[in-house]
UniProtKB/Swiss-Prot annotation:
GO terms for cellular component: cytosol. It comes from the Bacteria. InterPro entries: 6-PGluconate_DH-like_C_sf, 6PGD_dom2, Mannitol_1_phos_5_DH, Mannitol_DH, Mannitol_DH_C, Mannitol_DH_CS, Mannitol_DH_N, NAD(P)-bd_dom_sf. This is Mannitol-1-phosphate 5-dehydrogenase. Monomer. Signal peptide: none annotated. Belongs to the mannitol dehydrogenase family. The lineage of its organism: Bacteria, Bacillati, Bacillota, Bacilli, Lactobacillales. PANTHER family: ALTRONATE OXIDOREDUCTASE-RELATED, MANNITOL-1-PHOSPHATE 5-DEHYDROGENASE. NAD(+) binds at residues 3-14. GO terms for biological process: mannitol catabolic process. It comes from Enterococcus faecalis (strain ATCC 700802 / V583).
Length: 384
């Protein structure tokens, strides 16, 4: 069986690629990084190492690569012949691959291919595949064919893969834990059952549990750690103040998840404890700048902080630690990160209230006032 995977970065190789290879797929990685693509073409394999005491190495074979900038026709051809298409490129990049995917679907239609195909966006976002489907639809010549044969099931993915540099451009280190959950209701290729993947009738509880626990938690450690001067997640997790803030934030999101989705309280408490242990993994040195990047996106209305705050308010539940986190994020400075620079420019040029409303989408004056107080509370002293 053939899989096309967009995104040959660490998550693509270190998570999705590993699962697909274990299930017997030949994988064509699609990326614009010529160094990685060339190495995949030449070697047709790469190595994953688990970040724990075992340092177990896993060899992933039967792979190749295509550069979608220089070889778009071959990418279209690969999609036309694929049994599965997946992505791990980042939510902001999905629209850029939509046209190529549409061309691949249209090529299947022209060849009268009557083999169902699922296209799964494995991204840190709610409804990633649904969003990708909407983008792809803009370019389709034969939408009726796509409606019949192409599925875009949403997915939730979870594995910490830190930024890393190795002499070997294909070598990747990952945490042992991984979770990939797929919405079974929107699949077309039902005959494909991936081992190591959970198929569920209702994905939303799992996506929200992951987003509001792992992503909210990871970001909490990163921004709180940055405020206290730490460089890596594992360093920050040695500080009792950071751990206390993390636990408080996850208790607040946990209240929402239990109330909304009827998760068992004790099971969810164990899930939170597992997350804390994962963040404390001394074998992973994950840069705070990686986890804290793109703060404007992370402050979005549907994202890891604002959405739980809003939904807790709707249930008359308080979220003081989440609101404190918004103040901390607004004060995050990373000159290397475009959105961090942009956010600080906005705060320099407009009133704090205006920027809060603009970035978060929050309209309630009382909540804006509360966030403003937290922005001022965590402001760094200005150096003359």
């Amino acid at each position: 069986m053939n899989a096309v995977h967009f995104g040959a970065g660490n998550i693509g190789r270190g998570f999705i690629g590993e699962i697909l290879a274990k299930n017997g797929f030949h994988i064509t990685f699609v990326d614009v990084n010529e160094t990685i693509i060339q190495a995949l073409k030449e070697r047709k394999s790469y190595t994953i190492e688990l970040a724990d005491a075992s340092h177990q190495q896993i060899n992933v074979e039967n792979v190749t690569g295509l550069n979608n900038m220089t070889e778009p026709e071959k990418v279209v051809e690969a999609i036309a012949e694929a049994d599965l298409v997946t992505t791990a490129i980042g939510p902001n990049i999905l629209p850029r691959i939509a046209e190529l995917i549409a061309q691949g679907i249209d090529a299947r239609a022209e060849a009268n291919c009557q083999k169902p195909l699922d296209i799964i966006a494995c991204e840190n976002m709610i409804g990633g595949s649904t969003f990708l489907a909407e983008e792809v639809a803009k370019y389709l010549k034969n939408p009726a064919y796509a409606e019949q044969w192409i599925g875009f099931p949403d997915a939730a993915v979870d594995r910490i893969v830190p930024l890393q540099k190795h002499e070997d451009p294909l070598f990747v280190q990952v945490e042992p834990f991984c979770e990939w959950v797929i919405d079974d209701t929107n699949r077309k290729a039902k005959e494909i059952q991936l081992e190591g993947v959970h198929y569920v009738a209702d994905l939303e509880p799992y996506i929200e549990r992951k987003l509001f626990s792992v992503n909210t938690g990871h970001a909490t450690v990163a921004y709180t750690g940055a405020l206290l001067g730490y460089q890596t997640i594992d360093e920050a997790m040695q500080d009792a103040l950071v751990v206390a803030q993390l636990k408080s934030v996850l208790q607040e999101t946990g209240k929402l998840l239990v109330a909304k989705w009827n998760f068992d309280e004790q099971e969810h408490a164990a899930y939170i404890e597992k997350i804390i242990q994962r963040f404390q993994n001394k074998y992973i040195s994950d840069a705070i700048t990686r986890v804290a990047r793109t703060p404007i996106r992370k402050l979005g209305a549907q994202e890891r902080f604002i959405r739980p705050i809003r939904e807790l308010q709707e249930r008359n539940l308080v979220s003081p630690h989440l609101l404190a986190m918004i103040g901390i994020v607004f004060n995050y400075h990373d000159p290397e990160d475009e959105q961090s620079r942009q956010l600080q420019e906005m705060l320099d040029q407009e009133s704090v209230d205006t920027v809060i409303a603009e970035v978060t989408g929050i309209e309630d004056p009382e909540t804006v006032k509360n966030i403003k107080q937290n922005v001022e509370r965590y402001a760094r002293p200005q150096v003359a």
